[in-house]
Amino acid sequence: VQESVAKAFCALGNYLDAKSEFFDPDEIDEIEKKHLNFAMKNTNVVDAFNQARTALFYRIRGQHRHARTQRMIRYYFAAQDIHERANSTYFDYRQIAEQLKNTDLIFRIQRLLELQAQACHDITACLRQNTPYHYNIRVEKALMGTIQSLELYSKEHAEQNNVLLALQTLIDNLKSINWQLRQLEQETSENDQTAQIHTEQITGLKNILSVIGSNFTFESPLFRHAIRLS
């Protein structure tokens, strides 16, 4: 199970690296070719997630929750949310790159994505070596620099409404990715308790209602996963 989750984060890191290549101002003419590579990396992520999810379900079927399994569930949901955030911004990469090619903002976005990709690879290594993951403060500094750069660009190009909206959405999603990476370091037993995809038998009406109620919130990874499936 742990190896399957490690592979999921490895695929996710490769995916974020591929996304960062869209923000290279010196290779704008190569963007169409990069779309194919990006699509392949996305397919690899989906396949890795499916394998990790299957491994988790087999591990917990009919069993009480184990601390290590719960930890892997938390990591799985974090990886899924990171992928969702990174994949939810749709815009013309060529147009954005052309607009930003003479600014530092495009370099900052690329650098932030590269650091987030590296964080995913770091998580992969930690899972395989069974060592604690530590959030790299450089990722947070890169995010703060990107936000400040966007604020400056927005003031100087207030007329570019569509571009600014797309950029703000992108930065918001990258901010959410950073949050997930921080949370993995700050993981607690309370966080584990919220990540429930187990199939253990629950008896008694009171207990059933309690379990349902505890997951019927947007703070519950299980609830967000159900929305994605729907």
Regions found by a protein language model. Give the residues of each.
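Cytosolic regulatory and coupling regions of membrane transport/channel systems
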Residues: Q2-S230
